[in-house]
Every structure is written in C-alpha cells, then in structure tokens.
C-alpha cells in the first residue's frame, strides 16, 4: 500500500493528480499530512477528503529546522513501524525529507516525485537544495520532471529506477480546472 505524504501547498498541488489516479484506478493508498502548513488541511479535505494520518502539534513559532524535523520524525515513526507502506514524497520541502528519512529508518521504500532537480549551490535555496540531494539518496524510485534532472541523478551515481515523467503541476492544473469548472 502507498502512503502519499505532504505538508506544504506545493506538495499538495503536485501530489493531487497521484491521489486522484489512485482513487480512479482503485489502487490502495493512504495520505499523511505532516502539519507543516496547517491551513492546508481544509483545502485538502475539500479536494480529496480527510487525510488518513495527521501529525499534530508540529509547528511552533520561531522553531528551528532541527526542531521541526525531529517532531516530524518522532510523530511519523509509529505510523511507519506499524504499516508496510511505500512512501511517496514530492519535491524538496522539509516535510518530504522528514518522511523520506523516516521511511528509510523503517526500511520502507521511498518514491520521490520531482526527483533530480538541482541548483548546484547547497545554500540556494536553503535548506531545499540539501533536502533534494538527501531525498534522492534515500529513495528507491525517482520520478524526474526533465531530462536534466535525470542527468543530475546519474552524475550522483543514481542510475537505476529513474523515470522521466514530466511535472504533475500540468496534470494538477487540468484536474482542478475541470473539477471546479474554472
């Protein structure tokens, strides 16, 4: 079974087509909302129903990245220990890195959507560039948006299970405009 993980608006937007495709094809899946952008929960419920799992009390005012990361790891750990999910993460947000690391630590497969994007500057954007690199090395399957992103992975020694799939933002736009008759 798949566990589709998101915590930020871009993640939700880009994972929405995956969620809808799973529903349409009756592929078993669950969703996990990390709680990074709390206002997303209402938007997600409006699009796809209530998430299967929500990590609570994650965000605190002026907390460090390490504090946020540790909370996501601690709160997701029992969920991943108990269930043999294949974890799907998108992009480079801290929530994606946290879920990829938690999955790796629980010997779960990680599927990375939007894999291989690079600026080649570890601090721009920060911490996203480092998150991208670490997620790539924790992942088993890499869905790349461009040929260049596949080449980036190859340069890092990641040559297996890389697939050129385009960017799901295009699919999201189409799905949402059709669903809401925009």
Q: What residue ranges belong to the model's regions?
A:
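Residues at the starts of beta-strands that form the adenosine-phosphate
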Residues: 1, 28-30, 109, 141, ...
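Structural beta-sheet core signal
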Residues: 4, 31-33, 112, 164
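Active-site and donor-binding regions of nucleotide-sugar-utilizing enzymes
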Residues: 4-6, 11-21, 59-157
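Short glycine/proline-enriched coil/turn segments at helix->beta-strand junctions
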Residues: 24-28, 50, 81-84, 159-160
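Conserved nucleotide-sugar phosphate-binding/catalytic loop shared by glycosyltransferases and other
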Residues: 27-71, 75
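A nucleotide-sugar donor-handling region in carbohydrate enzymes
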Residues: 34, 38-39, 138-182
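Generic domain-boundary/flexible-linker signal
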Residues: 40-42, 98, 121, 173
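Short, hinge-like loop/turn segments at secondary-structure boundaries
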Residues: 46-50, 105-106, 127-131, 160-162, ...
